[in-house]
């Protein structure tokens, strides 16, 4: 059984202005299932962007077909650029940004991924300008040791430190290469993550360097008692997509600034048979199968968890005055949905009701008419449905926006009269968030572009 543990997506690995992958989460999941993989792990280049899409997509598939997808496990990881502060801050040696895979075993592990990625991006922004974001050994050590046992480490591709040390040692003495530095580094990483949470990584490839590394990893795995796994570092979906991926990589500068050829020949999602077809030429089928089966060790170590958080809208009552009972009695039949807000247990709902009633009363020529009542009905209904669907009160959001706009004007600054879909939501005009009446516009705008009861989502 096999799970692909090293994969890149277009949504995550291309975020740094560095063209990398053409994979989509949906197609990867579908193809992984077609190949009988037991799950999918996303490990974009220092980006956690695609994880929420992966978890949501698997959740939706399980809702449609629970039996088919119940054991298909989504796993979240990150391919970092591991280095020392000396390399970057003192030597300014940006070639020593070594690839390394981190995989979250659980929610605590995912929080550690977030901490490390945040530090890496901050160091990238304030230390030097580079499309690769450094994760320093010191930071990795600190975060992992704070709560040990929640992250899995894997040695990644040919861009990793141990691979470079293997190739350098071999080139120095091909007859009797000294891999002691590699062994020292691997032992240190195994100790850092905890034995059983660190894996050596092989990849199928026709490159001589990768074949050499795979052979040495086999020896070191046995010698150091560190298991190895086989990954494909997927940047595109299928073998026949190779030319499309190459054209994508060349689309910005024709590939002048990077290698776009040989390395990527085998970086696609593979079946077990395809992996064997590449690797059985220099390893035994049994040795290859061990690397395939060992991916299930990672599968078993990883729990499933949700990244969803409750939507919390902060609300401060700038005016705590309750709505007037007299005004409510006057307008409740004209705008029946006001009852929901007038009788609500939430302050923000009642305060918004107050604002609406006051506007209806203060500007009778503009607001006391049937088109206004109809527009209010549509807007209030959309807010009620959306608030219930998301277990929050969107009235609080609108009242805070109202105060922000008011503050801008009172400070003597300028604020745009409105933009986008909000320009069609009549209630925003009554709350003075936008500066024009949508009902008077010659070009018709629609409230449902901003919020609709059948599309209960976060507001613009």
Where are each of the predicted segments found?
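Non-catalytic structural connector segments
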Residues: 1-5, 13-15, 164, 169-172, ...
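Acidic, His- and aromatic-enriched active-site or binding-groove loops in soluble protein domains
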Residues: 73-74, 78, 99-107, 220-229, ...
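Acidic/polar active-site rim loop that often engages polyanionic ligands
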Residues: 85-101, 115-118, 272-274
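Conserved phosphate/anionic-ligand binding catalytic regions in large, soluble enzymes, centered on
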Residues: 229-238, 413-435
């Amino acid at each position: 059984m096999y799970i692909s543990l090293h994969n890149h997506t277009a949504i995550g690995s291309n975020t740094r202005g560095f063209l990398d992958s053409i994979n989509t989460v949906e197609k990867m999941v579908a193809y992984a299932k077609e190949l009988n993989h037991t799950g999918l792990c996303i490990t974009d280049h220092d980006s956690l962007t695609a994880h929420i899409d992966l978890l949501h997509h698997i959740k939706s598939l399980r809702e449609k077909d629970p039996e088919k997808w119940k054991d298909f496990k989504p796993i979240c990881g990150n391919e970092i650029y591991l280095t020392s502060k000396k390399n970057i801050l003192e030597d300014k040696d940006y070639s020593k940004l070594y690839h390394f895979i981190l995989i979250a075993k659980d929610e605590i592990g995912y929080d550690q991924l977030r901490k490390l990625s945040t530090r890496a991006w901050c160091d990238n922004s304030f230390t030097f300008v580079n499309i690769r974001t450094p994760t320093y050994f010191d930071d990795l050590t600190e975060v992992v040791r704070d709560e040990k046992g929640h992250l899995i480490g894997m040695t990644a591709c040919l861009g990793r430190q141990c691979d470079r040390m293997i190739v350098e040692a071999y080139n120095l003495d091909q007859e009797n290469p000294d891999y002691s530095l590699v062994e020292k580094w691997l032992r240190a990483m195994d100790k850092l993550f905890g034995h059983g949470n660190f894996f050596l990584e092989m990849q199928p490839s026709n490159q001589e360097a990768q074949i050499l590394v795979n052979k040495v990893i086999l020896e070191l795995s046995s010698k150091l008692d560190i298991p190895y796994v086989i990954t494909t570092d997927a940047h595109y979906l299928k073998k026949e997509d190779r030319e499309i991926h190459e054209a994508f990589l060349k689309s910005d500068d024709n590939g002048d600034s990077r290698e776009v050829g040989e390395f990527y020949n085998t970086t696609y999602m593979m079946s077990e048979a395809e992996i064997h077809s590449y690797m059985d030429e220099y390893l035994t089928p049994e040795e290859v199968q061990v690397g395939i089966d060992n991916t299930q060790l990672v599968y078993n170590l990883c729990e499933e968890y949700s990244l969803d958080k409750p939507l919390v809208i902060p609300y401060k009552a700038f005016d705590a005055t309750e709505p007037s009972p007299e005004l409510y009695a006057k307008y409740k039949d004209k705008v029946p949905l006001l009852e929901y807000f007038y009788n609500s247990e939430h302050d923000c709902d009642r305060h918004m009701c107050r604002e609406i009633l006051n506007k209806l009363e203060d500007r009778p020529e503009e607001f006391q008419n049937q088109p206004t009542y109809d527009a209010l009905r549509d807007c209030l209904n959309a807010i009620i449905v959306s608030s219930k669907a998301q277990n929050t009160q969107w009235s609080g959001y609108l009242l805070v926006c109202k105060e922000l706009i008011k503050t801008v004007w009172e400070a003597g600054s300028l604020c745009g009269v409105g933009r986008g879909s909000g320009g069609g939501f009549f209630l925003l005009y009554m709350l003075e968030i936008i500066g024009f009446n949508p009902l008077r516009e010659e070009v018709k705008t629609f409230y449902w572009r901003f919020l609709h009861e059948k599309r209960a989502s976060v507001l613009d």
